[in-house]
Amino acid sequence: MDKLKDKVIWVTGASSGIGKELAYQLSKRNCKLILSARRKEVLEKVKNQCSNPKDVKILPLDIIEFEKADSYVEIAIDLFGKVDIQINNAGVSQRSLIAETDFSVYKTIMDIDYLGTVALSKAILPHFMLNNAGHYVVVSSLMGKFSSPYRSGYCGAKHALHGFFDAMRMEHEKHGVRVTMVCPGFVNTNIAKSALTGDGTLQESNDSATQNGLSTTNFCNKMITAIKKEKFEVYIGGKEVKGVFIKRFFPKLLHKLVLKSQVR
Ligand SMILES: NC(=O)c1ccc[n+]([C@@H]2O[C@H](COP(=O)([O-])OP(=O)(O)OC[C@H]3O[C@@H](n4cnc5c(N)ncnc54)[C@H](O)[C@@H]3O)[C@@H](O)[C@H]2O)c1
């Protein structure tokens, strides 16, 4: 039997890309889903394209409204009576050199990619502790394990997620809490299009590395396997995944290889 069947899974960033594909694949597995992102009408569309729309609820939210995190969690729990797995997937990327980036852009990226996830995760923690069970799945990035030019704020925020959630795992394993850090390489979504540039406007164009990345279908299939296995940390992508191991043992080599690859 599928271990995820009938689990209540809350996915943030479910309106597009990885989050949308997760909704489709998890619905096929008969999970009960709560889909969150900012735009209600887009979430409705994703819901209606799921295999089992009657088991899909939508909860529109802006992840940077930290003060509403407790009420979002209360609503999420009420929708099916509990939440088993929270998939923290909402995020925004960056394409700008440090010298050209307004400080406000760093704040926005940190708010969305780090603090928003911390707020929602912290708000649901009492529920997980009460149930003596709960699984945080956090969509970080290979950029949470090593860095690359044009993404300084994004790399900072994704690295920070590892710091927070590794501590979460240690503090709450005794309460049945699990943490899976998912680090994608290049996945073919619109992440580059919605990436912030130095003045905070969107890049509005795709880049070839992302477009040539894994399909969301292939990526989410692997991600779901990692969730089922309750992996601590997983790297999913093409040859760029090797960067994690090269950084660990040969940091100067990784530095040279990233500069040589000239991925913008
Ligand atoms: N695509 C890649 O190559 C890649 C690589 C590494 C990591 N990731 C990570 O995967 C996750 C999903 O990205 P994607 O590739 O599907 O891109 P995407 O742009 O298609 O999806 C991002 C999602 O986050 C949501 N979001 C953004 N800001 C939000 C906010 N303030 N409140 C609520 N929701 C918000 C968007 O609406 C969207 O649903 C992100 O965390 C991203 O950093 C993607």
Predicted regions and their residues:
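Active-site helix of classical SDR
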Residues: 121, 157
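Conserved glycine-rich Rossmann-like NAD(P)H-binding loop of the short-chain dehydrogenase/reductase
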Residues: 29-46
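The beta1-alpha1 cofactor-binding region of Rossmann-like NAD(H)/NADP(H)-dependent oxidoreductases
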Residues: 60-71, 103
